[in-house]
Amino acid sequence: MSLNLSAEEQTAFDQLFKIADKQDIGVITGEEAVPFLEKSGLAPQVLGQIWQIADAENRGFLTFSGFVIAMRLVALAQEKLPFDYKKSGKIPYFADIHISGVDSSKFVQLNRPNNVSSGDGSDGSFLPPISSDEMTRYQQMFTTVCPTDGLMDGDRASSIFGRAPLSTEILARVWNLVDTHKRGALDIREFNTGMHIINLLLNGSLKSPPVSISPSFIASAASTSSVSAPSQYPGLSRSPPVQAPNIPVSDPWAIPSQDLTSFCQLFSNVDKAHKGYVSGSEAYSFFLASKLPEDVLAQIWDLSDTNSNGKLNIGEFCISLYLIKLKLSGKELPKVLPSSMLSSVAPLMQKSKSVPTSIPSVVPANISSPNPNPTLAPNPTGPSRVTSGTEDLLSLDATPFSPTLAPQHTSSNATKHSAPPVTKSAPFPVVSPLQLNHTPGFPTSPAAKPNSPTSTFFPQSSFGQTIAKNTMDKPSAVRTSVPSQLAAPIPQVASAEQLKLAAEVPKLESQLSQVKKSNDDLQKSSRDVAANLSDVKAKVSEIRKAYDEELAKAKQISLDIETNKAQTEQVNREYSILEATLNALQKQNKQKGEVLEQVVAESEAAKNMVESSNASIQQLKSEVADKEQTLAQLHLQLDEMTQRLVSLDEESKAVSQRKLDLEYKINNSKTQLATATEEYHEHSKQLEAEKQELSKLEDGLKSVNLTEEAPKPEVDSTPRFPSFTSNGITTDKPTLPDTTSSVPTQHNSFDAMHNTLRSPSLNSNNSSAHASTVSRNPFHNLKISGASSPVSNFWESEFASAVFPRSISKTTSLSVNNSSVNPSLDSEPVQLSNMEEPQHQDSSVVDVSTSASQRGSPVLSDLSKLTGSARNTAEPVENTSAEPIENTSAPTPFEIANKQQATEPISAPFATETISTPAPVKPPVPPSRRDRSAQDGVVQQATPHIQDEFPPIQFNEIDDDESSSDEEPPMSNLSPQISIGSVTNYTSAVTELPDPNHQLEMSTTTHVQHPNSETIPSSTENQYFDTTSGAFEANSNTEVTVNSNEVSQPFDFDTANESDNDDDELPVQQVVSGSLANDAFNVDDEFDNQFANLQAAEIKDDDNSSTDEEEHAGHH
């Protein structure tokens, strides 16, 4: 019966069948089915009903079709539905079994059965009851091991229990539980209980053996021990299965002992009649369950049937099952059975010989039978049909049989011969009705009917033909042996017996008459049967012919059906592929249509966006143009406001600087005023003393009569008189001889005071006390070169640009008298006023005049205050304009000399070389911090001074001879011009500096032009600040030309030190080449000459040189 399975059922049942078929032989035996079905949680009675329905043929095992029926019945029982297994339903639930690939909703929702013990209880009531199948199986095992007595000793029980794959500890606990009498042996109840516990442990129903078992459970384990097996296992209690011997396996073809035990159990299930062998019909259905081809099964049958008798005993059955197992595992079958395989089943073959086989017994016919003339009915014939392989196998035991009874011949002389009648010849043995009933394949009607026409059956399958060949060859021996038994001569009867027989003659005669009558009836019936037989033969031949034709047609139809099935399957596959392709194409077309619609919509949206974007762009362009125009206007306004802010800022800075200047001047003036006051008091005291001495000398002169005039003493032709400026600074103002007056020079004692008030000379005798010590003059580290040096001129320019921070015009000239420089000038600020550019501005020689004053000994203006001489007290008015203001006071001898010198050309060794410095000008830098590139003709940028190293020098203006003003004249009105013997013209724009410390942060970039006409460009963005307008103006770059011969002259330190310690004093007035100005300062003339000829010395100062290099790299 074929059942239509769903996909879920097919998947689930395949997995469950593989789990239940532990031996992997293609069928599920009763031993394997019991523990498997118990996991469903159903009662044993329900499982027994399910087994009877699934195993309808009562074969003792389940094929896959029977297993499917059992699974559906289990699912229906779990859902408590009627047993209708023809309809598909849910998948049954089995404890501890997981099935993959099936939805959980397809399973029966059933919890774990409660009747299965977990092994944790201490009472035996937790153990499930022993099913009848298990009880029968356990009883067979017990009776096999103990056939006589009712006890199983420990060795035999341990050998059986030890076959379970459990630990020794668990088996010992099981033994202690079931050995209730502690006698070292088990009866059938205890043995069944122990086997049941072991089975529960193996299938997972119990995790561990229980603590104790109730006596009632053990007593119920043997309640069915004397009852025969249930209907599905007929005859198991009558014939226990043969146990497989324990044969060591050393050869791959030898059958293992475990397999032999399993095969013997299967043999007992298949051999339901316990004949000791398995017929072809019984083996055929069992072998087909392995799903092997029929030709392979036929080969296995040929190898297993060692006796070629068409049936398999227990040893041959084990061989066939082992060969099936090897073939299923993928191994090839041997051509001939190996000796190791035969030796492994040899004990089973010997035991099978002692089992009687069912051979039909031959008995003589009973002559005195009350029914001597049985009626023979012909075998009915039906329509021909196609036989299957199973029918071929089932018909092997139905041997062709056509019994005929020969007529009996008795002695005519009944009185002389009294012997039982016998048949003379019989072609087939007479079989008893009992034997016929036990012969499979015979009809239920009487078989011993003579003249019964039968036809010989020829099986169609190769497997059936192989078995039929072996079976058809055997009955010939039996048929040939029967006549020999019937033809045996009857032994002679003794005389006594003859007398007895003679007494029975009348009786026998009467019987003879009856027999004759019966013979006549039989002959008549025989003739009738012969006539019927000819008719039947004719009909049989016709039917045989029709059968063969129909058989050929059936085969052809079968072939056509198979071909059509193959074609139909191919067409169905192609149809499935085409249908899937069509669905895929339709789906793709639909998707592409949707994408096309979406793309079209997006394209339309993009076009609209482009149009709106173009309109927005045009609008934005117009707005951008308006914004740009507005922005340009705003930029113009911003530039204008920026310029205004810059102007205001510069003006603010100028005012702040002016304020700081004034505060600084006020502080200096206060300090100088205090110093001058002290000096004034000292001079007053000295003057009083001198007056007293003078009065004494005058008194002495009056008393002395001079007869002749005293020689004229040699005094300084340029007497110096102390003078106090308006800010309290004392200055030395030379008094030049008046060429227009013939007033003789007065000789008084003020010259001594004047000499006393002079500053100590570098070469005077007053400094001899310090000759042995190291000079602290920073200029002693410089070397002296020739009469004139560009370095000295550069110092003059540096000091002029640093100490005169204000610039009225773009060009300011400064020339320092080399004979009036004092080291004390380094600590005083210098002021420089603007001068008008002379008419010969384009020439290389520019006349400069000076109006600076140096604090020192009293000058003429101060002396005039002391002596009470008249001075010009007119205060000059400060002029803030850019134009220079002329001095309204009378010209001084300095100015007269300078004006005369301005008209004459200057002849100097390097008068043709011009040094120009762009604005802004920064404070002076000592030679030790200058770059060493001066030897190459380039004056590098000076590094800033450290604080208080070289403070700026301040020069106060020189008052006029007739002036006695107490206030400082405005800086814009000063126009100092001093003529120097070797003059170098400097043209620079000076920037007003906020304070002395801030002046050190400024720097001056000087461009020097080498005699070889190598031009070095100056900074491209030099600017100077105009104090009158408060704005910066760009200064054009100029070139500076320096005589490299003069620059390269070394400085003589030895000469400088010797001249520093010299006691001789230079005269106050000194004439230099060209036009020389008078010395207005109280300093040494020799130092002035040295200062004019200074040259930078090569001094290795790592710190200063690194600073110079960094600053030089920053500017370049």
From Swiss-Prot:
Ca(2+) binds at residues 305, 307, 309, 311, 316. Residues 360-454, 703-774, 812-890, 909-978, 1004-1024, 1044-1066, 1095-1116 are annotated as: Disordered. Residues 401-416, 723-749, 864-890 have a biased composition (Polar residues). Residues 957-969, 1055-1066, 1104-1116 have a biased composition (Acidic residues). Residues 9-106, 134-224, 259-348 form the EH domain. Residues 755-774, 812-827 have a biased composition (Low complexity). InterPro entries: EF-hand-dom_pair, EF_Hand_1_Ca_BS, EF_hand_dom, EH_dom. Keywords: Calcium, Coiled coil, Cytoplasm, Cytoskeleton, Metal-binding, Repeat. GO terms for molecular function: calcium ion binding. Residues 371-381 have a biased composition (Pro residues). Residues 565-707 form a coiled coil. This is Uncharacterized calcium-binding protein C800.10c. It comes from Schizosaccharomyces pombe (strain 972 / ATCC 24843) (Fission yeast). The lineage of its organism: Eukaryota, Fungi, Dikarya, Ascomycota, Taphrinomycotina.
